[in-house]
Amino acid sequence: MTATTQPFVYRYPGLIPGILRKRYKRFLADIELASGEIVTAHCPNTGPMTGICELGAPVMLSKSDNPKRKLAYTWEMIQLPTPEPTWIGVNTALPNRVIKAMLLAKQIPELADHYDTVRPEVRYGTENKSRIDFLLTGEGRSPLYVEVKNTTWTKGKLALFPDTETTRGQKHLQELIDIVPAAKAVMLYFINRGDCTRFAPGDSKDPKYGELFRQAIAAGIQILPCRFAVSPEGICYLGLAPWESTEISGVG
C-alpha cells in the first residue's frame, strides 16, 4: 500500500476482502471470499484493465443491501505487488464522484479560482449530442469544460491513458479542441493508484489519441494528471503528476 499522510477525499464503506478468480463478459468477476465461498461480483469497468486484472490477486468488494440488485457485490479495487503492494481502483464510476466532491470543496488548486458553480453532465459538442463531465462557470469568467478519465495502466511509475484504442476518448478530445478558444477546457486524468509519479498519453495502444492529445496541448487545453492513493479505507489526493506529451519521452 502506498503510504500517505494526506486526508481522505473519499471514504469507502466497509469493504470485504477476497481473491480474484475470474473476470468475464466485461461486467462480471468471480471472487473467492475468506470463507472459501465463490461469489459473482459486478465489475464496474468496461475496459480491458490492461496490466491490472491479475488472477489470484487480492481484491476488495462493497456489498449492497438493495434486494432489487441482481448482484449484491461490486468489485472496488485490486492489489498488485509491483514494485511494492499497491491498491488500484477498479470502479470507473467513482472518479467522477470524487472529482465532483473535490470541485465543490475547491480542493483542486489549479481550478479553484475559476468558477462559482459546478454543473455535471452538461450537453455540448457536435449537435449538442455529447456530455461534458463538468462545466464550471463564474461571473466574469470563461466557461471551463472538464473531462475526467480514469487511469490505471502503467509502465513502471509512468501512468498512461488510454490502455486500449478508444474512439470515444478520441471524440472527447476533438470536441474539447473544437470549443477552444470560445471556452476553456481541461483534461483531468484520475490516476487511480498511488505508485505513479508521471503521466503520458498511451501512444502504443492508441496512436490517434496520442496525436489528438498533442493537438489539444497546442490548442491550449489544460492537462491535469491528478495522483490518488487508494486503500480499503479511502482515497487520498496526492497532487499533480508531471506529464510528457508522448509515451516514448515519458518512459524511463
Curated annotation (Swiss-Prot):
GO terms for molecular function: DNA binding. Coiled coil: none annotated. It comes from the Bacteria. Pfam families: SfsA, SfsA_N. CDD domains: SfsA-like_bacterial. InterPro entries: SfsA (IPR005224), SfsA_C (IPR040452), SfsA_N (IPR041465). Belongs to the SfsA family. This is Sugar fermentation stimulation protein homolog. It comes from Picosynechococcus sp. (strain ATCC 27264 / PCC 7002 / PR-6) (Agmenellum quadruplicatum). The lineage of its organism: Bacteria, Bacillati, Cyanobacteriota, Cyanophyceae, Oscillatoriophycideae. The gene is sfsA.
